[in-house]
Amino acid sequence: MRLDRLTNKFQLALADAQSLALGHDNQFIEPLHLMSALLNQEGGSVSPLLTSAGINAGQLRTDINQALNRLPQVEGTGGDVQPSQDLVRVLNLCDKLAQKRGDNFISSELFVLAALESRGTLADILKAAGATTANITQAIEQMRGGESVNDQGAEDQRQALKKYTIDLTERAEQGKLDPVIGRDEEIRRTIQVLQRRTKNNPVLIGEPGVGKTAIVEGLAQRIINGEVPEGLKGRRVLALDMGALVAGAKYRGEFEERLKGVLNDLAKQEGNVILFIDELHTMVGAGKADGAMDAGNMLKPALARGELHCVGATTLDEYRQYIEKDAALERRFQKVFVAEPSVEDTIAILRGLKERYELHHHVQITDPAIVAAATLSHRYIADRQLPDKAIDLIDEAASSIRMQIDSKPEELDRLDRRIIQLKLEQQALMKESDEASKKRLDMLNEELSDKERQYSELEEEWKAEKASLSGTQTIKAELEQAKIAIEQARRVGDLARMSELQYGKIPELEKQLEAATQLEGKTMRLLRNKVTDAEIAEVLARWTGIPVSRMMESEREKLLRMEQELHHRVIGQNEAVDAVSNAIRRSRAGLADPNRPIGSFLFLGPTGVGKTELCKALANFMFDSDEAMVRIDMSEFMEKHSVSRLVGAPPGYVGYEEGGYLTEAVRRRPYSVILLDEVEKAHPDVFNILLQVLDDGRLTDGQGRTVDFRNTVVIMTSNLGSDLIQERFGELDYAHMKELVLGVVSHNFRPEFINRIDEVVVFHPLGEQHIASIAQIQLKRLYKRLEERGYEIHISDEALKLLSENGYDPVYGARPLKRAIQQQIENPLAQQILSGELVPGKVIRLEVNEDRIVAVQ
């Protein structure tokens, strides 16, 4: 017999049998070795064959291993083993059986038949296990489906559906699929397309996360429950596992061979199987190399003839990119658009999924948490879709609560650390013999025993609370199993089992759960096992950096005295500070328009009066850092071509992948202060971009992504009209001056731009009385730098007055003050410190001497 007439699987099994004989120190390769190798072969035909013939393959494996251990062992074979006479006889018999059946190659299942017909130990073991020529022959016919073995890889193609698909209807029967709430219209439309005579292949198209895969799972559940038209009853929904199909296909044609096996198996099912291909676009081009056919082209004939009932799922972008390009493939599918559900629909979906997540995380999810997850995710997470983002919020909030339950409570942890600290001190004091140490040791022992008692009491309480939580968990799991069992009983029409569960077990479990939940509510002191809206807000704040949680008392107080906080840094600009503070308060109180930025302001005024400083102070107030501000110098955007830098280069231009300067900054930090400095210097086209931001709170970048500006404060600064402010300051009141300045502004900016700004704020020129306060603020920064080096410094009132006079210039505002501090204080101080005149540790006093500020110690 020629070994090259064996199928690939049979050849591999023969090699494994040789290895097994060597490992057992046997002189010959016996039929037992080959049978053991065939039984243990991954993806082999023998194990499923025996199972379908009603033989226990596990028990047979044990019997064969025992027989192998009884075979004679020979030492010093030198790694040379030969096939035994028995094995050669059985293999020749296999060849004879293959020829009788008209096979071109010998497949491994014929070995079982040949072993039964020959005499020997293996035949006896097989017969003892219940194998007969009749039942093995019948199982072979069933496995082959009336086909001959005309290909060396024929065995790999067998049971292709089992290997390369996942049975969704089976998973639905076992209750492993999440319930599908709503989506009735999409499921009905899918069923409608599946009922067609030809081209009965729906493709579900929608954004990522809207629930395309869930619709197919819903279809599988409806088929199981018999809630489908007659034409679909009893069908199976199989999901194609593209990973398994491609994995390990090393040689040209191996992938196509597997796919052909799947298609052949589907053709044999005669329309009883609906194939679900998730990420349908992966089929286009899969397996293509140097002119070879790809998977998409192999599917076309089966799809057109109606042999293959297929449901695809893909996103809008990928459908356009891959499937629309191939018109022949596109026409074979019927589009079913899956839209994003509304907030109300999402709440219904979350209520349906609630029990599954409670069961997984062992926590309780409250209804306010569900409502908060749907509404907050819709409001604050713009770049993802419902219900996916809301489900993720619930999942992560439940996970964080579970983590707290599993870890030691803070109170216990604090006591534990204190006990360790006391024990260390106790060890040190035990080595001392003086009276004070003994007295301290007695006190310490008393405190230690007290803390240990507290710890043990708390630990008992913690363990009891954990136990009560796990008790409710067990009841919930039992209840879930009972609900699955009642569904299974309903499908098979087992009325006795249904009534037993419906009126006996389920009400009893529900009663137990209610009692356990009430007990839990009373006793919980250390552990929280409820997910509330506060936890949802906390998780969302962690994701986006947007503070959506309920305001703490401290934050309320902080917001109410926001003006005072800002006045610590910005002197003499009451109108500007009030306008900004009111905008922030409106936003945090939830009264601001949700579709516009928190606030948009145009700050007008001469140079050096605090326009940029107010932005920094606001960023510091909101985010505790001056750096938490997106600062864009608009003088960089004076040319027309530089405008695209804000939103990103268009397709086809260099830098398209990099994104925009403004849009990327806001995508990364959606809650921020955006400062557009010297806005009048920008090219007029920049204002066209800003119109969209100021009105709708959103902007589309170069790659077509929508960036959300609704949680930003947009501040633009400009020097327009500053000459008027300088001239008329003191003559007119604020309202008149603002009117004059707005006249100048309206000549430079278009009406639709000015109209969209919340407030135009005019800054006053600074008076001499303001400069003294600003001098103190700037000197505090100098004091801080000197303190770090060990110097303490005080300034006299005369020195402060002189500094304010020297640093005051009505045209340049507070900027000359910085230069005055540098020249009159910092320069002399630096010289004196370096020369050693001023030493650390002593107070430095700044005083006036002959119209000069001098430092003395």
Curated annotation (Swiss-Prot):
Q: Which organism is it from?
A: Escherichia coli (strain K12)
Name of this protein: Chaperone protein ClpB
Induction context: By heat shock and other environmental stresses.
What does the entry list as the binding residues for ATP 1?
A: G206, E207, P208, G209, V210, G211, K212, T213
Q: What is known to happen upon mutating E678A?
A: No effect on oligomerization
Its annotated compartments are: Cytoplasm
Chain sites annotated for binding ATP 2 = G605, P606, T607, G608, V609, G610, K611, T612
Q: Where mainly located?
A: cytoplasm
C-terminal: annotated span: 766-857
